[in-house]
Amino acid sequence: MTSAEHLTKGQQAEDRALAYLEQQGLKLVERNVRYPFGEIDLIMRQGHKWIFIEVKYRQSKQFGGALQAVSRGKIARLNRAASHYMQLNQIDAQCRFDLLAIDGDDIQWITNAF
């Protein structure tokens, strides 16, 4: 798979994740927020709560699946990026970190994942 194909698959997975989460009542704030030290795939709100979401996609579970693809380093970078985002935007509210794992056609949403 070329890097362009990989990006397209990743974008499609994020689009699926966003549609799924909006169906669950979450509201999109921003997507693909990037800092030199980390990236946030989706930032959403549910009432007054801010939700930072990592989206992981795998075509199948053959090599461990999407859930196993989240490393401690990735979690640390997501935490740092979310803290930075909240400081920059002067947000003083509850937040949580969710994981949306997509393995082929299977979607698994884990709230308070980290």
From Swiss-Prot:
InterPro entries: Restrct_endonuc-II-like, tRNA_endonuc-like_dom_sf, UPF0102_YraN-like
UniProt GO molecular function: nucleic acid binding
CDD domains listed in its UniProt record: PoNe_Nuclease
Domain of life, source organism: Bacteria
Pfam families from the UniProt entry: UPF0102 (PF02021)
Family: Belongs to the UPF0102 family.
Protein's recorded name: UPF0102 protein Shew_0226
